[in-house]
């Protein structure tokens, strides 16, 4: 029972550590966004930073689309970031196989990509890859999808298939240009709290204090499957520990009953000689 308990706790603690350090270290605890581009994200950041649980924040813009290279296609979510600010809210810097965040300089249209997506597309450092945006450009010749060539300047491996196979990073001003925004316009802010499990309440409190058409969304909503996995993990730990304790208690009781039954003859002799139950 003790061996099984130690084994179960070790496995669950390892799972919890990997979940926290890898997956939860990559996604924001919450985001503050607006339906329209945010022109002065620094002013928004000053409002958000007033909340006592906010440890760090960084601007971001997201865009879904397709990457194509030599006839191969892969769906992708581009997270456009400011490399210096992103280090405050994400641990991506520690998972690069090649390149680094510093390669994402404005105007270069550089991109870093997960190793699974790179392998599927046959990409290596320095290759050109075409991003196909889910929008069209209207010209006198007709409508054409919006395309942009990026240069692969980094490859990372986090160890989570959802991230390694479908996430790419680019500079935030480059994606603003691709979306025909001003270079300093962003979609919103990524937040990091001192306690990620307080994110729902903290995000709600922040949303109540913001002026304008802003809304906050915490990680339990944006990554609901991950939240359910963590809840299931905690429930399973409780059930397994309860089962292990019950089995151990049953073994102890069974052993005591067998010992008493085995000593039945000796007890009868002692009672015949006049010994009281207390003396026995």
Residue positions per predicted region:
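Mechanotransmission and gating elements of multispan inner-membrane complexes involved in transport
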Residues: 36, 135-138, 143-237
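Hydrophobic alpha-helical transmembrane segments of multi-pass inner-membrane transport and secretion
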Residues: 1-13, 231-268
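Internal alpha-helical transmembrane segments
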Residues: 2-4, 8-18, 22, 26, ...
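Membrane-interface junction motifs in transport/secretion proteins
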Residues: 16-46
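Amphipathic alpha-helical segments that mediate coupling or scaffolding at interfaces
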Residues: 18, 22, 155, 192, ...
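Short amphipathic alpha-helices in soluble, non-transmembrane regions
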Residues: 44-49, 92, 202-209
């Amino acid at each position: 029972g003790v061996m099984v308990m130690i084994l179960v706790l070790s496995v669950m603690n390892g799972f919890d550590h990997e979940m926290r350090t890898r997956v939860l270290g990559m996604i924001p605890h919450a985001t503050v966004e607006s339906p329209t581009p945010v022109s002065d994200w620094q002013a928004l950041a000053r409002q958000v930073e007033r909340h006592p649980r906010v440890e760090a924040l960084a601007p971001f813009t997201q865009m879904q689309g397709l990457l194509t290279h030599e006839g191969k296609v892969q769906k992708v979510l581009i997270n456009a970031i400011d490399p210096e600010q992103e280090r405050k809210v994400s641990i991506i810097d520690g998972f690069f196989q090649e390149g680094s965040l510093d390669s994402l300089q404005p105007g270069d249209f550089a991109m870093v990509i997960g190793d699974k997506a790179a392998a599927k597309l046959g990409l290596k450092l320095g290759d050109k890859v075409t991003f196909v945006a889910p929008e069209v450009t209207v010209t006198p010749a007709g409508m054409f999808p919006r395309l942009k060539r990026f240069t692969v300047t980094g490859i990372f491996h986090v160890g989570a298939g959802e991230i390694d196979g479908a996430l790419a990073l680019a500079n935030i001003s480059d994606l603003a240009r691709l979306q025909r925004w001003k270079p300093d316009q962003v979609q919103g802010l990524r937040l990091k709290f001192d306690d990620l499990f307080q994110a729902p309440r903290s995000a709600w409190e922040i949303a109540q204090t913001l002026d304008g058409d802003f809304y906050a969304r915490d990680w339990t909503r944006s990554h609901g499957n991950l939240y359910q996995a963590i809840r299931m993990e905690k429930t399973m730990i409780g059930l397994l520990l309860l089962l292990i304790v019950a089995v151990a208690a049953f073994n102890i009781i069974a052993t005591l009953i067998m010992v008493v039954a085995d000593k039945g003859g000796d007890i009868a002799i002692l009672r015949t000689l006049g010994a009281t139950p207390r003396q026995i």
